UniProtKB/Swiss-Prot annotation:
Record's miscellaneous remark: The porphobilinogen subunits are added to the dipyrromethane group.
Enzyme Commission code(s) on record: 2.5.1.61
PANTHER family: PORPHOBILINOGEN DEAMINASE
The protein's name: Porphobilinogen deaminase
Species name: Clostridium botulinum (strain Hall / ATCC 3502 / NCTC 13319 / Type A)
Length: 290
């Protein structure tokens, strides 16, 4: 049996797809090949995502490949997947999640707490920028885009004091040794689905059940809780929004942030994990009442 798995052309996207292929090979005797696709989001790098249509731009071209039956499945970073799936598509599995935290990589290994006043920090994320300003109002936030390596190189090229990147991506491309500091999830609430990979298929695909073996239940319901939170707030890359759900002893805890009326609101909620979707919705409702 041969499966074609679509993914973006970036090194990180290809590594993430290889992770899924390795998991598939361990579970089933399946030959897999990658179909590399340059998405609209990859082509337009000089403009911020919220001005050109959002993170869905990383997904749409890949879904077209599945519609045209050029690919059997796709691998995405769940933080790039819009909360509304197109008709006929589904996320069939979310394997065990990687580290969800954000990391700081600095020039000359200077710690975040030791940054000079007015330090220039690179990030294209509204969520990161807003939380950086809460931690250090004096910081100068510089918008940057590009793949992981490109953004790290911009520290010197654009005379930055540092950049903020997801720990998961750095680990997957073996660049985590460059990390200067890790942000706690309460001081820098992660993006919805950060650190998680999702396998997308057409609902009618005859072999889709093979991917279900890769599902990690607790990781999946945590991501689904975060996505319920985002859906209730109608959040996207135009929004300053983040959430992180975690589970301990069957109890789920979710922390979420959302910008409302020019104010960053942060709330937390706890409940049994079987109520994961209700918890995400309830947390959003608490924020809307603030």
């Amino acid at each position: 049996m041969n499966f074609v798995i679509a993914t973006r052309r970036s090194k990180l996207a290809q590594v993430q797809t290889e992770i899924i292929i390795d998991l598939l090979n361990k579970k089933h005797d399946i030959e897999c090949e990658k179909l590399l696709i340059e998405t609209v989001g990859d082509k337009i790098l000089e403009v911020s995502l919220d001005k050109i249509g959002g993170k869905g731009l990383f997904v749409k071209d890949i879904e077209v490949a599945m519609l045209e039956q050029r690919a059997d499945a796709a691998v995405h970073s769940m933080k790039d997947v819009p909360y509304e799936m197109p008709k006929g598509f589904e996320i069939i599995a979310i394997p065990e999640r990687e580290d969800v935290r954000d990391a700081f990589i600095s020039l000359d290994n200077i710690k975040f707490k030791d940054l000079r006043k007015g330090a220039k920090i690179g990030t294209s994320s509204r969520r990161r920028a807003a939380q950086l300003k809460l931690l250090r109002p004096d910081l100068d936030i510089v918008p940057i885009r590009g793949n992981v390596q490109t953004r790290i190189e911009k520290i010197k090229k654009e005379n930055l004091d540092g950049v903020i990147l997801a720990v998961a991506g750095l680990k997957r491309v073996n660049l985590d040794h460059l990390i200067t500091d890790y942000f706690d999830t309460k001081e820098m609430v992660p993006a919805i689905g950060q650190g998680a990979l999702g396998i997308e298929v057409m609902e009618e695909h005859p072999k889709k059940e093979l991917f279900k073996d890769l599902d990690h239940y607790n990781s999946k319901i945590c991501v689904l809780a975060e996505r319920a939170f985002m859906r209730e707030l109608d959040g996207d890359c135009h929004s300053t929004i983040g959430a992180y759900a975690s589970i301990k002893d069957n109890i789920m805890h979710i922390i979420g942030i959302f910008e409302r009326k020019n104010k960053i609101i942060k709330k937390e909620i706890t409940g049994t994990k079987d109520q994961y979707e209700k918890l995400g919705i309830s947390l959003a409702e608490h924020i809307l009442k603030d």
